A protein has these predicted regions:
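Active-site and substrate-binding clefts of carbohydrate-active enzymes
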Residues: 2-55, 76-77, 191-510, 534-536, ...
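Short, well-structured secondary-structure segments
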Residues: 4-9, 14-126, 130-131, 148-152, ...
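Extended, Lys/Arg-enriched charged tracts that mediate electrostatic binding to polyanionic substrates
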Residues: 48, 64-65, 74, 82-86, ...
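Acidic, His- and aromatic-enriched active-site or binding-groove loops in soluble protein domains
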Residues: 91-104, 108-109, 133, 145, ...
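Short, charged, surface-exposed secondary-structure boundary motifs
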Residues: 123, 181-190, 227, 305
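CE4/NodB-like, metal-dependent polysaccharide N-deacetylase domain
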Residues: 128-152, 245-259
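Beta-rich nucleic-acid/ligand-interaction surfaces
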Residues: 154-161, 180-184, 301-304
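Extended alpha-helical scaffold segments
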Residues: 651-806
Length: 806
């Protein structure tokens, strides 16, 4: 019997982009990273692209790309983010699929995923079709080939979903064993119920569909997958490998496939560093010839299904009640509110379904004026989503060449309205414990954007009825009390138009010198007039610009005036462009009042002239708001630092005496001391030339005073510094002075903090060793003193970095 092993990772993160900006904004809970995508990329996606295999002494003996060995799917919305924000990791994923084809008889490791992770059985046929087509096209665009299989979000399945997969030439999908209803050998009449007997997961099954089509199904081994998901199996790669091989059964089949499927984030994010267990699992199986590593496409070609199966419709892998987790108070929850309930799920689903149907009516009514089949146009819209620069070609090829500016904007708004009507069904919105959670807020933001676009193209008010349905969705919190209050307090204030983008541009121009043309998230600003007047700490700027949406092409010419009072108070007025002479007169009046120091008159003129369209620091988008706020507080920071440094330096001796007498430091002394020492440590580490003497002095002071170090921040800045130094070493691997600096730096650093992210530096060091070590050893063996010194230092660095030298 031939034995095969396949481990599938479902890699996905909920889309977190602000629907009006198309960017993920800063998420404080992900500190020290910018956002959760960034954090999980560092902990998981990056780790699996260069995973370590450890030898008996727990040192790195090899670095491998796990994606070349495992079967995997990546969410299209996640890949879009990775392509832009982590291009090296993105490239590793794409390259892994190419490499895997050489190992798996031409079959790639990657399979597709339904576009934005909706619960397919709860979608109408039209949305199912678009989800599958967008998932396929996104896959082809990125991986350069057609997908053989597709991952169904939450493995939620019904026959109609399988029909859509089969219609689009997809050969297989992966399900949990409890989603099988009954099976039989092909050609037999008798069915065997899965109830009461475990389904044999080591073989593929053929599922006959009502239309006459068929699709192959793989049912993963659930007990092993569960042990992997909860982390127990990932503490040791050898145990993991043996457990995978325990899946094989004693039967007369010519081959068996031991396979599991789990969230890809299990390997590194849910359980830190467990990517190494996965890497060692593959290594152990292959090294000991326990089985052959494969992917589903290869196995299916070699061993077509000899059994057929019927599924349990409306089931999933993550809800004991089928698919009720995404539409009712079924009892499945995450545990955040132990005495709470999820009665909000039903009204939220109802609100989205009602909105979808209303949006469909608007879309069909207007888009039918331009094309015969509006829904076929929506299916093709993915091509423009993936290449926003091709908008003119897309419109001329799909709609027509003689469109006016207004028609182009209207068509693009309709298509965007439909894109957001799909995004608002992202499954995470219902998965967790409350409608006030960030996942539910995210999908309601998509709904809000779709509502806004519908109003702009048709004048229809869908918001009132939508909020009325949400009002029936109770939260598990006292405030906000229901979905309507969540929407009004947490979603509606984020709604953005071109005027607000103009305000963001105008206000931020006080702190950043912009070129005449600048991108502002998914918009662009073209400045035609800009005047700035400084009077001490106060600033007045007036200007004229055109704000343009790079998504729907809409343009909005604006005039603006912004005033900074010198502290955290700044105000701006923005409105549609006024007559040239009126604007010129206003600028002169504002400038005259400002130079006289009459800010009251400046504000009166702004308010009257711009129709009360006033904006402040609160209207800036989050990242820029935070940056400007910190800039405004720079003087305050300096004053605090000066004060704390005075306390620290003038009381250092008494603090040292108190600690020598085992007297705890009072907060009034320890807080300033910790602030100053942590700041000085970070600054010393970040300096271009690390002064190891100063670093050692600061560490000694922290120890003598028993001060608390900010280890999380120190880890972050240290990792960046080590990566920088290692990049320099990569360019000059024989630089002994640099090796000595690294040795000194490591000896001090690792005496105060642990668990520094060394992955990038280990990768570089490992490659330097492979390229340079033997040459240096030969030189040292021939008596070259510099080479001997190089070997001594390189071996010390290898110990610090945990890399074995071959």
């Amino acid at each position: 019997m031939e034995k095969y092993v396949c481990i599938h990772g479902h890699f996905y993160q909920p889309p977190r982009e602000n629907p009006w900006l198309e960017e993920v904004e800063m998420e404080d809970s992900a500190y020290p990273y910018h956002d959760w995508n960034d954090k999980i990329t560092q902990e998981c996606y990056k780790q699996n692209a260069a995973s370590r295999i450890l030898g008996p002494n727990k040192k790195i003996i090899d670095i491998v790309n796990n994606y070349t060995k495992m079967s995997f799917d990546f969410g299209p919305t996640l890949l879009s983010w990775l392509e832009k924000h982590a291009p090296d990791i993105y490239a590793s994923v794409i390259e892994a699929d190419k490499i895997s084809r050489e190992s798996f008889s031409g079959h790639g490791a990657a399979i597709a995923q339904a576009y934005n992770h909706i619960i397919m059985p709860l979608a109408n046929r039209r949305d199912k079709q678009t989800q599958v087509l967008w998932g396929i096209y996104d896959f082809e665009h990125r991986f350069g080939r057609k997908p053989e299989g597709m991952w169904l979000p939450e493995t939620a399945v019904d026959l109609e979903t399988l029909e859509v997969l089969a219609e689009n030439q997809l050969k297989f999908t992966i399900l949990a064993p409890h989603q099988a209803n009954r099976y039989r050998q092909v050609g037999e009449k008798e069915w065997k119920n899965v109830d009461g007997s475990e389904l044999d997961t080591t073989r593929p099954y053929l599922c006959a569909l009502p239309s006459g089509q068929t699709i192959s199904l793989f049912f993963y081994h659930s007990p092993t997958a569960t042990e992997v998901a909860n982390g127990r199996l990932l503490q040791n790669g050898e145990s993991f490998a043996k457990k995978m091989c325990d899946i094989f059964t004693e039967n007369n089949c010519p081959s068996q496939l031991a396979h599991i499927a789990t969230d890809g984030e299990t390997f590194g994010h849910h359980h830190r560093y467990t990517d190494m267990a996965l890497a060692y699992c593959f290594h152990y199986i292959e090294f000991n010839n326990l089985a052959r590593i494969t992917v589903y496409g290869e196995y299916l070609e070699k061993f077509p299904p000899a059994y057929e199966v019927e599924i349990r419709e409306n089931t999933s892998w993550s809800c004991n009640h089928g698919i009720e987790r995404w539409r009712s108070n079924c009892g499945c929850h995450y545990g955040k509110y132990p005495s709470g309930a999820q009665q909000w799920r039903g009204p939220l689903r109802e609100a989205m379904d009602w909105l979808r149907d209303e949006l469909s009516g608007v879309y069909e009514k207007i888009m039918s004026q331009y094309v015969d089949n509006p829904w076929a146009l929506r299916d093709r819209y993915i091509k423009l989503i993936l290449d926003r620069n091709s908008v003119e070609d897309f419109l001329s090829n799909t709609v027509g060449q003689n469109l006016s500016y207004e028609e182009k904007v209207r068509i693009l708004k309709l298509l965007e309205m439909q894109r957001h009507s799909l995004l608002m069904y992202t499954s995470c919105g219902w998965y967790f414990d409350d409608i006030s959670g960030i996942e539910a807020i995210q999908i309601m933001q998509y709904a809000c954007r779709a509502i806004q676009l519908a109003n702009e193209v048709d004048g229809i008010d869908l918001e009132s009825k939508f909020k009325g349905i949400l009002e029936r969705a109770p939260t598990n919190t006292r405030e906000p009390a229901n979905g309507r209050e969540v929407y009004d307090s947490l979603i509606r204030p984020n709604r953005t138009d071109l005027n607000r983008v103009g305000a963001h541009f105008a206000l931020s121009s006080l702190f950043t010198e912009y070129p005449d043309e600048i991108d502002v998230f998914c918009y662009s600003a073209t400045t035609e007039v800009y005047d700035r007047v400084d009077a001490g700490i106060q600033i007045l700027a007036t200007g004229r610009a055109t704000i343009r949406s790079n998504i729907v092409l809409e343009e909005h010419p604006i005039d603006f005036a912004v005033l900074h009072f010198g502290d955290h108070n700044l105000t701006g007025s923005v409105n549609a462009r006024m007559a040239d002479d009126a604007f010129a007169n206003l600028r002169e009046s504002l400038k005259r009042a400002f130079t006289k120091g009459d800010t009251t008159e400046v504000m009166r003129l702004m308010n009257v002239s711009f129709g009360g369209n006033n904006y402040s620091l609160w209207h800036l988008f989050k990242d820029e708001q935070r940056r400007i706020l910190y800039e405004l507080l720079e003087t305050v920071w300096r004053e605090i630092e000066t004060s704390f440094r005075h306390v620290y330096e003038h009381n250092y001796m008494i603090m040292e005496m108190m600690r020598s007498m085992n007297i705890p430091l009072p907060k009034a002394l320890s807080t300033p001391a910790e602030f100053i020492l942590n700041q000085d440590l970070c600054q010393t580490i970040q300096n271009e030339q690390v002064n190891t003497g100063e670093l050692r002095r600061l560490v000694d002071q922290a120890r003598r005073l028993s001060l608390q170090l900010d280890e999380e921040t120190l880890r972050f800045v240290s990792s960046k510094k080590i990566n920088h130094l290692m990049a320099k070493l990569e360019k000059s691997p024989d630089d002994i002075n640099l090796l000595e600096s690294l040795d000194s730096f490591f000896s001090i650093l690792f005496s105060i903090i642990s668990n520094v992210d060394l992955q990038t530096s280990q990768n570089v060091f490992f490659m330097i060793g492979k390229k340079t070590y033997m040459e240096m050893k030969q030189r040292a063996d021939s008596g070259k003193a510099p080479a001997k010194k190089w070997l001594e230092l390189f071996n010390k660095l290898a110990n610090y970095l945990g890399v074995a030298i071959h």
